[in-house]
Amino acid sequence: PTITNDGVSIAKEIELEDPYEKIGAELVKEVAKKTDDVAGDGTTTATVLAQALVKEGLRNVAAGANPLGLKRGIEKAVEKVTETLLKSAKEVETKEQIAATAAISAGDQSIGDLIAEAMDKVGNEGVITVEESNTFGLQLELTEGMRFDKG
């Protein structure tokens, strides 16, 4: 069995028989996948927000609200939230800040420290690849130049 609290991993496992429920589940899967693709984190938050938007949207439409008006309202709200978030965003600059941010995202301080070390070595424009291993523990491997896995 897999134990996870990652929204995208959980969403991938949802399989429903009812066609209407299946549509909803596919919507949630898409929200989680797109969030994971774009941000790499926040899938659980995105899933909860999607559920709230759908629930309240359906409730408002059932009460007689115009669906297109709701859509326009949601789009305006998204613009405002995005603007506010960008204004309050802070650049993560120091190795300690990177480690703290990565540790929160990974849910593990040792992984956060390793990612901060990797970023310190490759810089902001470098590439970091995380792979699963058959061995126990964490390992950092630095490859200078280019690396081709297949050719």
From Swiss-Prot:
Belongs to the chaperonin (HSP60) family. It is found in: Cytoplasm. Keywords: ATP-binding, Chaperone, Cytoplasm, Isomerase, Nucleotide-binding, Stress response. ATP binds at residues 41-45. This is Chaperonin GroEL. It catalyses: ATP + H2O + a folded polypeptide = ADP + phosphate + an unfolded polypeptide. It comes from Mycobacterium marinum. GO terms for biological process: protein refolding. Its EC number is 5.6.1.7. It is an enzyme of class 5 (isomerase). Gene3D superfamilies: GroEL-like equatorial domain, TCP-1-like chaperonin intermediate domain.
